A protein has these predicted regions:
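Bacterial Sec-dependent N-terminal signal peptides
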Residues: 1-27
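Central antiparallel beta-sheet cores of small beta-barrel/beta-sandwich binding domains
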Residues: 25-196
Length: 196
């Protein structure tokens, strides 16, 4: 109904402001905390290459190395059957906060952290390569604790985890690659033709 549509539009605008409103100082303290929990156990789906091959990314282990750097371990799966373990790092370089906190029964988000990543696959040399690019990750405050943002309303089409970049094979072949928890970024306009 109309009320629900207006509610969804308002929520969308609030999320849009999140990405735009950068805070100056109090949020800098957040970056000093251990943010491992924001990355741990993430499962995302994405696309690899011009032909938009499906890729699944699962982060299995996270460890804080220094104030802004985290060691990451996980697995990638392409063609639904080729599984490669990977390890690497994420570096957090900035933070934004929502101009208004979003707290409801289904959605909790205080802002996003941003940075870059580099993950090297190991295992079968024919299939392994290196992922690199930039990311954003939603967070929420729970008392003094920082936790993953939460969204249970699929209609919002809101990514709480989003990675954009490239994959470079051991032989030097480079492919565009992006993945997320909800809506895959950078999909071509005719994406549905690939995936019908």
């Amino acid at each position: 109904n109309m009320k629900q549509k207006i509610y969804h539009i308002i929520i969308f605008l609030l999320f849009w402001f999140c990405g735009v409103a950068y805070s100056q100082n109090p949020k800098a303290d957040i970056l000093q905390q251990d943010l491992s929990g924001l990355f741990d156990n993430l499962s995302m789906i994405g696309i690899l290459g011009e032909d938009c091959s499906r890729i699944d990314i699962h982060i299995t282990e996270v460890r804080k190395m220094d104030s802004r750097e985290y060691e990451i371990k996980g697995i990638s799966r392409t063609r639904l059957s080729v599984i490669c373990p990977f390890k690497g790092k994420v570096c957090v370089d900035s933070i934004s906060s929502c101009s208004q906190m979003i707290k409801s029964e289904y959605t909790e988000l205080d802002g996003f952290i941003y940075g870059y990543y580099s993950f090297a696959e190991y295992g079968d040399k024919r299939y392994s390569g290196t992922f690199s690019g930039s990311f954003k990750q939603g967070y929420r405050m729970s008392g003094q604790q920082i936790e993953k943002g939460r969204n249970e309303i699929a209609e919002l089409k809101l990514n709480l985890s989003e990675y954009r970049g490239k994959w470079k094979s051991a032989k030097g072949l480079t492919k565009v690659c992006s993945w997320a928890d909800e809506i895959i970024p950078d999909t071509p306009a005719n994406f549905c033709l690939f995936n019908d």
